[in-house]
């Protein structure tokens, strides 16, 4: 009996690990926002140009991660430059780049990250069935070879903190060195974004459903 209970506990623990983190929970009803929404008028004069640039390209404007980043204006400036490369100038095709981002959105159950990048991934050509399988917690079916590499590298790096020689050389053959490095770079950067969003308990825009229902 005890062995059966132990095996059941282990199985549940493994299952919990495999489906990733629990959904990022919204603030308690009536609780003040951890980081009140920053306005353009509150941003220092020497960061105004940066803020205007962000408003032009961000689907959430100064909300989401930027609301938190601007608490450290120099960091916001450096991060914006990094995101400019990783979003718009990376060697990875946009389809694969956005796939890598929503993988981290799924792993962190990041409400804003998934809300913002799921439609971008589909627009870039990622099959909806692949994105929906990912969100359901299963290995996506019918992935192309390059999508498989993006998924496997991202998952192994997140969950094992390394990748096997076999996967490394497979990824290098399919993506090439630059795309492989850019893949890991965008993945790590969007872990940072997810952590910032979790720090501030940032959610989907008001009136929009949460991609990951709070538990």
Residue ranges and their predicted role:
Residues 1-10:
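Bacterial N-terminal signal peptides that target proteins for export
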Residues 11-15:
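Short, linear, compositionally biased motifs with a strong N-terminal bias
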Residues 22-215:
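Hydrophobic alpha-helical segments
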């Amino acid at each position: 009996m005890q062995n059966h209970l132990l095996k059941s506990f282990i199985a549940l623990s493994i299952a919990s690990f495999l489906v990733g983190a629990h959904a990022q929970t919204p603030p308690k009803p009536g609780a003040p926002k951890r980081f009140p929404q920053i306005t353009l008028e509150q941003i220092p004069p020497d960061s105004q140009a940066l803020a205007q640039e962000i408003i032009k390209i961000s689907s959430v404007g100064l909300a989401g991660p930027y609301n938190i980043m601007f608490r450290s204006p120099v960091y916001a400036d450096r991060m914006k430059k990094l995101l400019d490369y990783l979003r718009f100038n990376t060697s990875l095709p946009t389809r694969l780049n956005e796939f890598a981002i929503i993988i981290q959105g799924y792993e962190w159950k990041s409400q804003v990250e998934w809300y913002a990048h799921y439609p971008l991934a589909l627009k870039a050509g990622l099959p909806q069935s692949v994105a929906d399988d990912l969100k359901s917690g299963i290995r996506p079916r019918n992935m192309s070879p390059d999508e498989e590499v993006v998924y496997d590298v991202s998952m192994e790096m997140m969950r094992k903190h390394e990748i096997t020689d076999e996967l490394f050389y497979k990824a290098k053959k399919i993506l090439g060195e630059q795309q492989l490095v850019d893949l890991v770079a965008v993945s790590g950067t969007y872990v940072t974004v997810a952590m910032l969003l979790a720090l501030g308990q940032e959610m989907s825009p008001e009136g929009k459903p949460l991609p990951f229902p709070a538990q």
